């Protein structure tokens, strides 16, 4: 297993400090990894990949963790997603597994707001866009939604547009 970077160790420390209710062995925190994605406009996105066993604890303590992380990494838009690489053990990605990864990462990237649906718009033979629709009460700015779309593109390789779903009662 590769060693963690200084930033990964720092994020792991923040999670340990603010999510005391996580009952996981200390080595689980060593599986936290970070992927940096830089948008066309120069915005930097830090995608923190956390093991499944602690993701729920991160989400339960999200406001405290994100506040502490932004104090240390103020130049980044930070999001937490499930670390499938830590679970995979080098297995090849099947089509079913790829679909599961996409569905989970879509929901994780939009947290703390609810993903109400997706819609794929086909514009041409090799040109399609996946519209990620969030609950109407979302308070994300247009820039934050664009950052989530760019992060998903960096993670999954498809074009994503994140927007509010105005057609639901949420």
Curated annotation (Swiss-Prot):
It is found in: Cytoplasm. One of its GO terms (cellular component) is cytoplasm. Its main location: cytoplasm. Coiled coil: none annotated. The keyword Amino-acid biosynthesis does not apply. Keywords: Cytoplasm, Ribonucleoprotein, Ribosomal protein. Belongs to the eukaryotic ribosomal protein eS7 family. Component of the small ribosomal subunit. This is Small ribosomal subunit protein eS7. It comes from Encephalitozoon cuniculi (strain GB-M1). The gene is RPS7.
């Amino acid at each position: 297993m590769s060693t963690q970077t200084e930033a990964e160790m720092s994020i792991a420390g923040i999670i340990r400090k603010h999510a005391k209710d996580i009952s996981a062995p200390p080595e689980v925190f060593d599986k936290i990894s970070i992927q940096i994605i830089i948008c066309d406009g120069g915005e930097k996105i830090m995608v923190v990949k956390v093991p499944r066993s602690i993701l729920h604890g991160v989400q339960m303590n999200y406001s405290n963790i994100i506040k502490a992380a932004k104090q240390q990494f103020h130049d980044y838009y930070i999001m937490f997603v499930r670390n499938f690489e830590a679970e995979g053990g080098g297995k090849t990605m099947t089509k079913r597994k790829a679909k599961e990864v996409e569905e989970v990462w879509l929901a994780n990237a939009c947290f703390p707001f609810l993903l109400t649906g997706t819609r794929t718009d086909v514009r041409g033979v090799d040109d399609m866009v996946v519209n990620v629709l969030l609950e109407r009460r979302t308070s994300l700015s247009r820039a934050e939604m664009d950052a989530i779309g760019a992060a998903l593109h960096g993670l999954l390789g498809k074009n994503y547009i994140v927007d509010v779903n105005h057609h639901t009662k949420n």
